Amino acid sequence: MPLLDATRRRAGLLLALAAASLFVGTAAGADAWPSRPITLIVSFEPGGSTDISARAVAQALAVELKQPVVVENRTGAGGRIGTKAAALARPDGYTLLWGSGSSLTAAPVLYPDQGHVATLVPVSLGATQSFVFVTNPTLGARTVQEFVALAKRQPGQLNFASAGMGSSNHLLGEIFLAATGAPVVHVPYKGAVMAKDAVIRGEAQLMDEVTSPLIGALRAGQLVPLFMTGERRDPAFPDIPTAAEAGLPEMTIQGFFGLLAPAGTSPDIVARLNEAMRTALASEPVAKAFGNLGFTTAYSTPEQMATRIAEGRATYARIVKARQIRVD
């Protein structure tokens, strides 16, 4: 019996030691994060505003986390491919998404296969950007009221250009048409550049886009601004009224970018990433990069970002239903 008792005690001690080492190893693994490079997925092409802003944030996060943060462009399908890749990645804190508002709000409403987007865990907003509604100067409209009056005098004769069916500027344009009753025809183009060129040529008479791609054309007088969708006037364009000032308070809608992680990511990692984002967004290089893009820095808690996403989806869901918008 004494020998059996000793054997049992020894076995129990070994099990206790194994459990303790497993607990310590797990805790050490969590405490050690990040111990290797982090991948930051960007769903759009290199050189665009989403990519440029992501790279600025990645460099600042690398300083805070003391590990490289490598931007990986997973492009295609209007940002849906990269967003899906991030959502389905391992939730270990080593794959993150620099998400755009359109991919997080409009896409899930329009595309049934984008349900996984709702599982992404918000970390923090990074930036916001207003849209500006513009028209061709030869049309003669300088205000929303003048544009709507012209459109109603010639119903179906004016065109509204967008970057494509289901794009954020398409849906925002539909909100404008619903709010004003302007009888304008939607014409989808293959990207915002083609849509902008169509308005400059006079082929289309209206479009909306975030400010950065339109700065040159606005300053050259090739496009006439009607209003911007931000809550406050843009310091770079102080003469352009806000949506509320133009009589359209319901169009105070901004684009946004932010950091997200796959579902199941440890709350401790999310909290650490959020704190790193707070510091990164306050850094001079990020402020400079965002300023050049016409972005406004917008740190948030995960809960605040989740609210922003939910509100955006609800807004787009209402307009998609009301205007019976379908995409192929």
What are these regions (language model features)?
Residues S49-S53, V57, G82, S102, ...:
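Stable alpha-helical elements in mature extracytoplasmic
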Residues G115-L125, A161, P183-V187, Q205-L206, ...:
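Short beta-strand->loop
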Residues E45-G47, G101-S102, N136-A141, S162-S167, ...:
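Short coil/turn segments
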Residues M1-L17, L22-T26, R55:
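Twin-arginine (Tat) signal peptide motif
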Residues L88-Y94, V109-M194, A243-E245, F256-A289:
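Hinge/capping helix and adjacent helix->loop/strand transition within the periplasmic-binding protein
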Residues G29-T119, G156-N159, G181-L206, V210, ...:
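N-terminal (or domain-start) structured segment
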